[in-house]
């Protein structure tokens, strides 16, 4: 997965353009907290950031792109603790619980990004891969040296499925973290 993701989200931007994107994302974060995911628009974010709508759409061509960029920013700023635990099962469970807590703490972002990542917006394709690569890397790190790629992929698929169920309201993100404990233990049985 990571081989498909080679360029950072702001590759090719000069310092001023990167600063504009950062202002837009900071404004989007504030706007999301105040109005929620349903009411958030690229235009309202542009207004809050003090840039024209045309400028905002240059960097964030769609609402889905905005949510995906916000979520990737959230993942990168999250700074998870180093995976701790006596064994790979405990370390992966710590990773899934941390991610679930992070989503539970940002329900509006979780709601917006769920729809964005499930959509067919081509502007989100690269970000979808980068987000998935972030999950894969966290699982790989928790498993340690020599992690079986099939196990890593299975964990990523299980986590994605749990995200989908939580995003559909079938469980809370907190419940997702709890339920993934059993899933992780089952997947890793015999592989650690």
Which role fits each region the language model picked out?
Residues 1-7, 101, 137-145, 168-192:
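C-terminal peripheral helix-coil segments that are non-catalytic and often amphipathic
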Residues 23, 44, 65, 94, ...:
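Amphipathic alpha-helical interaction segments
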Residues 101-143, 164, 168-169:
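Short secondary-structure transition hinges
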Residues 69, 80-108, 155:
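Hydrophobic alpha-helical connector segments
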Residues 1-19, 30, 192:
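N-terminal intrinsically disordered/low-complexity leader segments
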